[in-house]
């Protein structure tokens, strides 16, 4: 192929193609088909421009080279074939002098008569397929597209072919000649198929023996041997109807392709039922902290020491009592468990030296709360093979739950700023190479936007709790260890602060497999009255344990302090992921970075500084019933972070399923918005798969509600 290209094309074109391939790091000795394609495209661009001039009256005329009028103004400016820097300089110059809109991608030509950029395409496939690909990539009404094929077909924007018929015929004849020359040398099939990315390597050797038998056995239905299947594939027309392709694959498939129009999609049906309940492993917006600033006490940094110091800052303790019972639990046991924690903490304080860890007495209330001796006895399967009615436990279907407003409030709160810094710069990692200067700048800007965010507090809280629980589960397997729920931050003045949210008591934890469960009881402080949204706290028993004096603009006021108690469980694998919640920072930073990259590629310079410092510009954050919500770049950073954090906090099979299935519908809707005229079959089945995941999970239900808002506004 390389020899053919050098013989068939003008040396200047060959040299330009070599430069282009070198610029993109491609080896023309290996990518010979690409080499031929670039030469062909260059030649078509030059032929398109040749002999076309504009006279003094501004009319387009065709003039042969030996004509004395060849000093007339060229009608077309050739952009293709120049190196990228020079090409963009030419484009910018044209835009400045003509007022044309700057294209996002480098076009091939500029037409001074029609005042428009032109994108030339040369395809070995169907012209309309290639045209759609070009149009979808460019997404600009200002760039004119003209596609030629090797079979003499052509397609142009609005059927406006720009050139006279004779000029176009010259191009088509040249393409047909190239095709014939390639075919004569046995190069055409490889060249034709390479545009579709087809592998042709199997044509070079014969499959025999065992591999041949395996090939014959693994054919799709209705094909008796490999030759038949090969013949079918070779003659396969890519522009055939999808229905036809499907029916050829299997007699069982009978799919009717339906056009997907603006009126086609319906909203996702959310389940009815009682409101959904809070299921996170720790309280989020309702959490209350007992804090100490600039901790310098003996044993500072040892969780139990820190916890006792924080507990001493509160003086409003009172005799606890139940204000919202757990419907199914033995509520007095929860009350007794809290009293036991207070008593055992008091015992520690009375000791001469405070221990580093505290194992609780195995009282009846804790045994009940932690499910001690409740698990059924495990019997080896071999010992019960002969039991005729051996069967798995009957399990009830989960009860359907409806979306409740509290989860949207939780998300909104997670996006807000607090008055403390929750991460230091080194949480994301230091530079390791000079090239990371821009990365450092982006990281610093991003950190500044999210370090005060409540979602970042949830990350650090989650990392601490999961690390402490996993350590205790491994180090004290048989003990009911008391684990303080602690976080650390800095005040806006830069002072260190240690916070206590409550306590966890861990149950027995002989965790052999990743999915083996350790039970724990969580006891968390809060100022939220559970009677305001009792459905949210279905899984909790809530006690009133004290009164807190709060300073406000009108003076001091007393508020009841509550303790939210519940039995919960987790596993090694869940704790492992919980310990790695800092990944959420990285994920949201990468999403922001892709936005900066998109902006930078359009402007052709790094836009990091402008992106973060232009406070007047707003960005789309998400959909709501009101429409598309906009906000500052900081709000975008915090929203993306909160989404990532909630995906971690509320991780579940329902979320996995909903994300995977709803994405398919999203892609079809996106194709419709891009005017790609998508078609679908079994759309009902897709809706079924999506709605199957909407059971009772609050975060999934909220995402489904957001998806419906998106559908409403995307298809207006």
Swiss-Prot record:
Its EC number is 3.1.-.-. Keywords: Cap snatching, Endonuclease, Eukaryotic host gene expression shutoff by virus, Eukaryotic host transcription shutoff by virus, Host cytoplasm, Host gene expression shutoff by virus, Host nucleus, Host-virus interaction, Hydrolase, Inhibition of host RNA polymerase II by virus, Manganese, Metal-binding, Nuclease, Phosphoprotein. Its cofactor is Mn(2+). GO terms for cellular component: host cell cytoplasm; host cell nucleus. Mn(2+) 1 binds at residues 41, 108, 119-120. GO terms for biological process: cap snatching; DNA-templated transcription; symbiont-mediated suppression of host gene expression; symbiont-mediated suppression of host mRNA transcription via inhibition of RNA polymerase II activity; viral RNA genome replication; viral translational frameshifting. A motif (Nuclear localization signal 1 (NLS1)) lies at residues 124-139. It is an enzyme of class 3 (hydrolase). The keyword Hydrolase applies. The keyword NAD does not apply. A motif (Nuclear localization signal 2 (NLS2)) lies at residues 184-247. Phosphorylated on serines and threonines by host kinases, including human casein kinase II. GO terms for molecular function: endonuclease activity; metal ion binding; RNA binding. It is found in: Host cytoplasm; Host nucleus. Belongs to the influenza viruses PA family. HAMAP family: INFV_PA. Plays an essential role in viral RNA transcription and replication by forming the heterotrimeric polymerase complex together with PB1 and PB2 subunits. The complex transcribes viral mRNAs by using a unique mechanism called cap-snatching. It consists in the hijacking and cleavage of host capped pre-mRNAs. These short capped RNAs are then used as primers for viral mRNAs. The PB2 subunit is responsible for the binding of the 5' cap of cellular pre-mRNAs which are subsequently cleaved after 10-13 nucleotides by the PA subunit that carries the endonuclease activity. This is Polymerase acidic protein. It comes from Influenza A virus (strain A/Tokyo/3/1967 H2N2).
């Amino acid at each position: 192929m390389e020899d053919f290209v050098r013989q068939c094309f003008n040396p200047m074109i060959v040299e330009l193609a070599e430069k282009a391939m070198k610029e993109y790091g491609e080896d023309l000795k290996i990518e010979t088909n690409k080499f031929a394609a670039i030469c062909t495209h260059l030649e078509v661009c030059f032929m398109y421009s040749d002999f076309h001039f504009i006279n003094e009256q501004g009319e387009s005329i065709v003039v042969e080279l030996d004509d004395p009028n060849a000093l007339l103004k060229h009608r077309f400016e050739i952009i293709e074939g120049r190196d990228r820097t020079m090409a963009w300089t030419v484009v910018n110059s044209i835009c400045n002098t003509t007022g044309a809109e700057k294209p996002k991608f480098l076009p091939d030509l500029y037409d001074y008569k029609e005042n428009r950029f032109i994108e030339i395409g040369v395809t070995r496939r169907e012209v309309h397929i290639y045209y759609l690909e070009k149009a979808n990539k460019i997404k600009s009404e200002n760039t004119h597209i003209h596609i030629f094929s090797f079979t003499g077909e052509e397609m142009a924007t609005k059927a406006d072919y720009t050139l006279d018929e004779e000029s176009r015929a010259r191009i088509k004849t040249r393409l047909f000649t190239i095709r014939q020359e390639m075919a004569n040398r046995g190069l055409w099939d490889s060249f034709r198929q390479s545009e579709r990315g087809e592998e042709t390597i199997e044509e070079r050797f014969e499959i025999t023996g065992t591999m041949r038998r395996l090939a014959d056995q693994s054919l799709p239905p209705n094909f008796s041997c490999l030759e038949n299947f090969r013949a079918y594939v070779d003659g396969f027309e890519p522009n055939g109807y999808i229905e036809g392709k499907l029916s050829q694959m299997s007699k069982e498939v009978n799919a009717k392709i339906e056009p997907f129009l603006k009126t086609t999609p319906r909203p996702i049906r959310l389940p009815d039922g009682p409101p959904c309940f809070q299921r996170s492993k720790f309280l989020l917006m309702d959490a209350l902290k007992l804090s100490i600033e600039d901790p310098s006490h003996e044993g500072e940094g040892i969780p139990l020491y820190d916890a006792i110091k924080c507990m001493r800052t509160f003086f409003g303790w009172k005799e606890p009592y139940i204000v919202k019972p757990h419907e199914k639990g033995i509520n007095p046991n929860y009350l007794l468990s809290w009293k036991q924690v207070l008593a055992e903490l008091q015992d520690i304080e009375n000791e001469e030296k405070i221990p580093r860890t505290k194992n609780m007495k195995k009282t009846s209330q804790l045994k009940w709360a932690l499910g001690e001796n409740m698990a059924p006895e495990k019997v080896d399967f071999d010992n019960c093979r002969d039991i005729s009615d051996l069967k798995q436990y009957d399990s009830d279907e989960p009860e359907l739950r409806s979306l409740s407003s509290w989860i949207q409030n939780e998300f909104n709160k997670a996006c807000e700023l607090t008055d403390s810094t929750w991460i230091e710069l080194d949480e994301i990692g230091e530079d390791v190479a000079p090239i990371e200067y821009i990365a450092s700048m982006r990281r610093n800007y991003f950190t500044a936007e999210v370090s005060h965010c409540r979602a970042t507090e949830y990350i650090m809280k989650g990392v601490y709790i999961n690390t402490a629980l996993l350590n205790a589960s491994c180090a004290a397997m048989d003990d009911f260890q008391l684990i303080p729920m602690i976080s650390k931050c800095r005040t806006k003045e830069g002072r260190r602060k240690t916070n206590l949210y409550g306590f966890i008591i861990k149950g027995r934890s002989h965790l052999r497999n990743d999915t083996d469960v350790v039970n724990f009881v969580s006891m968390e402080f809060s100022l939220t009255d559970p009677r305001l949204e009792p459905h949210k706290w279905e899984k909790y028993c809530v006690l009133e344990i004290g009164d807190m004096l709060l300073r406000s603009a009108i003076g001091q006021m007393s508020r009841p302090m509550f303790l939210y108690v519940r039995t919960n469980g987790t596993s090694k694998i869940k704790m492992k992921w919980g310990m790695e919640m800092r990944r959420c920072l990285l994920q949201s930073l990468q999403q922001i970075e892709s936005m900066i990259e998109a902006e930078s590629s359009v402007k052709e310079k790094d836009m990091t500084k402008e992106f973060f410092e232009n406070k007047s510009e707003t960005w789309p954050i998400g959909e709501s019933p009101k429409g598309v919500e906009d906000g500052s770049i900081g709000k975008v950073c915090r929203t993306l972070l909160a989404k990532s954090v909630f995906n971690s906090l509320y991780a579940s099979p329902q979320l996995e399923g909903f994300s995977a299935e709803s994405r398919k519908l999203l892609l079809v809707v996106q194709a419709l918005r891009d005017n790609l005229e998508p078609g679908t079959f079994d759309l009902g089945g897709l809706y079924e798969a999506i709605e199957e995941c909407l059971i009772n999970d609050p975060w999934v239900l909220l995402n489904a509600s957001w998806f419906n808002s998106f559908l409403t506004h995307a298809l207006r």
